[in-house]
């Protein structure tokens, strides 16, 4: 069990001012929800980031994604998405459920990470599936963090999301081929 105390409401409110100031000096926002209470103001954070036209990427947690309403993209894995939309029995069922969720939450995109099946980007024009990079898997620790981090960096440069997903997928494939949590070098990614 996890016995950490929730952050005090006053503490979180105090940090919102700092958050607002930082928005103008950054090109993307990544919010990783660990279900610890640190993102109790996530709706406000998303709205403020939207107002300054930042791409907002969310690594979701739990079974209520309504708090991520208006984000640019959320990046659940299969188990996380199942908690919210239920089990799908076919690819067509998955597409319908993912697109319905994306539309209900007014997300630009939903990026489903699918382990050995790669990832699928659900967007207004349909979906794009990017196959996993063919390599041996040694450790999946940090793969999701790598994917969202690289995706954010590419979107921050103005790269179209369809291209950014390809690079993020490549980065995820590189880190699972290493032991422990690992970084991806520029040479590994683009060399």
Where are these regions (language model features)?
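Extended, hydrophobic alpha-helical segments in both membrane/secreted and soluble proteins
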Residues: 30, 45, 54-58, 64-67, ...
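Solvent-exposed alpha-helix faces
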Residues: 20, 99, 169-173
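Short alpha-helical functional segments enriched in proximate histidine and acidic residues
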Residues: 22, 104, 174-175
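Conserved post-catalytic alpha-helical subdomain immediately downstream of the catalytic base
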Residues: 108-109, 133-190
């Amino acid at each position: 069990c996890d016995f950490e105390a929730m952050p005090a409401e006053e503490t979180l409110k105090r940090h919102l001012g700092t958050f607002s100031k930082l928005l103008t000096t950054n090109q993307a926002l990544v919010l990783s929800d660990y279900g610890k209470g640190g993102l109790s103001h996530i709706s406000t954070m998303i709205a403020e980031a939207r107002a300054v036209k930042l791409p907002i990427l969310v690594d979701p947690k739990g079974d209520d994604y309504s708090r991520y309403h208006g984000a640019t993209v959320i990046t659940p894995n299969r188990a996380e998405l199942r908690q919210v939309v239920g089990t799908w029995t076919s690819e067509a069922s998955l597409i319908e459920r993912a697109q319905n969720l994306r539309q209900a939450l007014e997300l630009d995109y939903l990026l489903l990470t699918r382990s050995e099946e790669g990832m699928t980007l659900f967007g207004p024009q349909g979906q794009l599936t990017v196959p996993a990079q063919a390599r041996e898997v040694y450790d999946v620790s940090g793969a999701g963090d790598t994917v969202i981090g690289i995706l954010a960096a590419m979107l921050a440069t103005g790269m179209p999301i369809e291209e950014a997903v390809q690079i993020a997928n490549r980065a995820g494939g590189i880190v699972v081929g290493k032991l422990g949590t690992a970084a991806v070098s520029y040479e590994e990614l683009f060399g």
